[in-house]
C-alpha cells in the first residue's frame, strides 16, 4: 500500500455541520507519552453514512529506534501489512500530516463541528492530543465511539453482537471502513426505531 492524498475528483459531499469525520491511527504501542503514531487516515461521511469521501492515508516517519521498541505483536502486525517499511520510507512528520488533513477536512466540515468518529476512538484522541494537538482541536470535544454500541450489544443482545465479524486488518483506512460498516450494522439490527404510529401517539399525548 502506498500513501494516499486527498482525491481531486468532484466531491460527493457538500460542506455541512452534520458531516462526520472518521479517523483511525496505527501506533507503536498504547501509551501516548512513550509511543508514537505511525499511520493516520480520515474519511468524511454524511450524517446517514450513505455518502463518503476518503481523505489522506499517511504513514508517519519515525526513527529506527522507535520502531525497534515496538512489542512483538506490533512488530508482527505492522510488518505483515507493510506499514513498517512505509514508515521507514516516509518523509511525512506529524506536523505535515496535521496540515494535510486539516486542509482536507476543512473542505467538508467547519472546525469544531464533527465529533471524532471511530472504534475505541478515545485512544486515537489521546495520541492526537499528545502528538498532533492542532488537528485534535479541529474536532468537537465529543466522540462518536462505535465501541460503545459494541459493548452494549454484547451485553444486551449477544446474538446480534456475534452477527458482525471484524476482519482485523489493522491498517488505518480499512479499519475506518470497518467501523462505518459496524455502525450501519448496529443501526439496522440493534438500534430499532419506534414505530411511526407509536411515535406520533407519544407526540400527541405530550401536547
UniProtKB/Swiss-Prot annotation:
Keywords: Cytoplasm, Exonuclease, Hydrolase, Nuclease. This is Oligoribonuclease. Its EC number is 3.1.15.-. Disulfide bonds: none annotated. 3'-to-5' exoribonuclease specific for small oligoribonucleotides. One of its GO terms (cellular component) is cytoplasm. Residues 20-183 form the Exonuclease domain. Pfam families: RNase_T (PF00929). Belongs to the oligoribonuclease family. The active site is at 141. One of its GO terms (biological process) is DNA metabolic process. It comes from Paraburkholderia xenovorans (strain LB400). NCBIfam families: PRK05359.1 (NF003765). It comes from the Bacteria. It is found in: Cytoplasm. The gene is orn. The keyword Nuclease applies. One of its GO terms (molecular function) is 3'-5'-RNA exonuclease activity. The keyword Hydrolase applies.
Amino acid at each position: 500500500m502506498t500513501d494516499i492524498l486527498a482525491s481531486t475528483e468532484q466531491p460527493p459531499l457538500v460542506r455541512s455541520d452534520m458531516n462526520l469525520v472518521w479517523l483511525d491511527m496505527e501506533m507503536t504501542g498504547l501509551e501516548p507519552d512513550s509511543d508514537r503514531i505511525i499511520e493516520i487516515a480520515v474519511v468524511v461521511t454524511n450524517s446517514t453514512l450513505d455518502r463518503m469521501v476518503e481523505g489522506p492515508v499517511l504513514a508517519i516517519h519515525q526513527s529506527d529506534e522507535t520502531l525497534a521498541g515496538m512489542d512483538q505483536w506490533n512488530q508482527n502486525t505492522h510488518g505483515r501489512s507493510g506499514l513498517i517499511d512505509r514508515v521507514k520510507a516516509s518523509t511525512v512528520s506529524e506536523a505535515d500530516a496535521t496540515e494535510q488533513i486539516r486542509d482536507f477536512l476543512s473542505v467538508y466540515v467547519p472546525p469544531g463541528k464533527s465529533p471524532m468518529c471511530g472504534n475505541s476512538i478515545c485512544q486515537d484522541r489521546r495520541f492526537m492530543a499528545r502528538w498532533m494537538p492542532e488537528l485534535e482541536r479541529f474536532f468537537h470535544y465529543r466522540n462518536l465511539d462505535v465501541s460503545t454500541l459494541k459493548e452494549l450489544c454484547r451485553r444486551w443482545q449477544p446474538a446480534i453482537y456475534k452477527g458482525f465479524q471484524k476482519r482485523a486488518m489493522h491498517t488505518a483506512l480499512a479499519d475506518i471502513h470497518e467501523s462505518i460498516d459496524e455502525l450501519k450494522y448496529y443501526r439496522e439490527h440493534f438500534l430499532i426505531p419506534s414505530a411511526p404510529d407509536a411515535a406520533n401517539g407519544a407526540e400527541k399525548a405530550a401536547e
